A protein has these predicted regions:
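A structural signal for multi-pass alpha-helical bundles of membrane permease subunits
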Residues: 1-170
Length: 170
C-alpha cells in the first residue's frame, strides 16, 4: 500500500476519477431544469415525445453511445467542431477526445448526456408528487413564481437531489 499511495500515477488516477465524478454531477441541475420544462408541457403527446427524447440515451447501449460521440467529437468533421467553425467563420479542429488536456471535458460531456434523461425522469417524478395545494396556498398568500420555486419546489425536491447525488457519485 505504501508504494501504491506514493505513486504519482495512482494519485493522478484518483484525481481524474474525482474530477469526472464531480463533472458528472452537473447532470443533476440540468436534469432538474429540463424536468421543470417537461412538467410545464400540458399536451400529453408532446410530453411523451419530450420525455422519450431525453430518456433515449439511457436505452441506447454503450457501444452505440461511443460511436455516436466518436462522430460528434471528431477533430476534422465532428458536429461540434463544424458548428464552432460555422459560428466563428474559420476552421476549428479541437481534439475533444485526443487532446490530453480536453479528454476529461469530452468524457464529461458523454457522461452528462447519458445520465441526463435519468436525472430528468427522477426530478419529473418528484415535481409531479408535489401537491398542487401548496402552490395554490402560496399564490393566495401572494408568493410569486420565484418564491414558490424557492420555498416549495426546491425543499420538496431535496430527497430526489440527494438520491441523484449518491447514485451519480457511485
Amino acid at each position: 500500500y505504501k508504494v501504491l499511495l506514493e505513486s504519482s500515477g495512482f494519485r493522478k488516477s484518483i484525481l481524474n476519477t474525482l474530477i469526472l465524478a464531480l463533472m458528472s454531477l452537473l447532470a443533476i441541475p440540468l436534469g432538474f431544469v429540463i424536468a421543470c420544462g417537461a412538467n410545464g408541457v400540458r399536451n400529453k403527446k408532446a410530453q411523451t415525445v419530450f420525455r422519450l427524447g431525453f430518456y433515449m440515451p439511457n436505452i441506447i447501449t454503450g457501444v452505440s453511445i461511443v460511436l455516436i460521440f466518436q462522430y460528434i467529437l471528431q477533430v476534422d468533421n465532428g458536429l461540434i467542431n463544424l458548428a464552432l467553425s460555422n459560428i466563428l467563420g474559420k476552421k476549428i479542429e479541437i481534439g475533444w477526445l485526443s487532446d490530453p488536456s480536453l479528454t476529461k471535458v469530452g468524457a464529461s460531456i458523454i457522461q452528462i448526456w447519458t445520465t441526463l434523461g435519468y436525472n430528468m425522469l427522477i426530478c419529473l417524478a418528484g415535481l409531479q408528487s408535489i401537491p398542487t395545494e401548496l402552490y395554490e396556498a402560496a399564490m393566495m398568500d401572494g408568493a410569486g413564481s420565484f418564491r414558490r420555486w424557492r420555498y416549495i419546489t426546491i425543499p420538496l425536491m431535496r430527497n430526489n437531489f440527494i438520491f441523484l447525488f449518491i447514485t451519480g457519485i457511485i
